[in-house]
């Protein structure tokens, strides 16, 4: 293949003891690029980014049809959100989402951090999970998607057309 570009994780977490990403990484500054592949217009939204709906919308408005969200997320509060946020984001933006999470533990921090819960899945633009991997096994999830569904859902719901960006100024203020 060839190099298409890069995305840098936009939101850096500091949410749990022993989880110090903010000490090692700076927030990304490249915006929300979409990459034209031979098969799909692809967006990337990394791990903790998924908790911020604005980025999903920016990727969709930039033309993404399929957005991948690679993650390394452990059990606890985020498991419920894992099952909720990405289907809701797919439906709100008329995109497919590949929700990718690792499995197992990371030594020597396993006792402190817990277990990564896998459960990767592919969700369609209607917010329905079409394929899902298991909680604890290393797996390769392969699934064929129907890109016509992106246009169909966007044409039906018209969420982009009916946005009221004139009223959303507060969303971009600090």
Label each residue range with its predicted role:
Residues 35-38, 125, 145:
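Active-site beta-strand termini and strand-to-loop segments that position acidic
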Residues 41, 47-140:
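CN hydrolase (nitrilase-like) catalytic-core segments centered on the catalytic cysteine
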Residues 1-2, 18, 39:
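Glycine-centered tight beta-turn/hairpin loop motif at sheet-sheet or coil-to-beta transitions
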Residues 30-62, 150-174:
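Cysteine/selenocysteine-centered motifs that mediate thiol-based redox chemistry or coordinate metal-sulfur cofactors
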Residues 1, 5-7, 133:
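Short hydrophobic alpha-helix segments
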Residues 4-6, 34, 98:
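Soluble catalytic domains of enzymes that build or remodel membrane lipids, polysaccharides, and related
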Residues 23-26, 110-112:
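Short Gly/Pro-enriched turn/cap motifs at secondary-structure boundaries
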Residues 9-24, 137-155:
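A short, polar/charged loop-to-alpha-helix boundary motif
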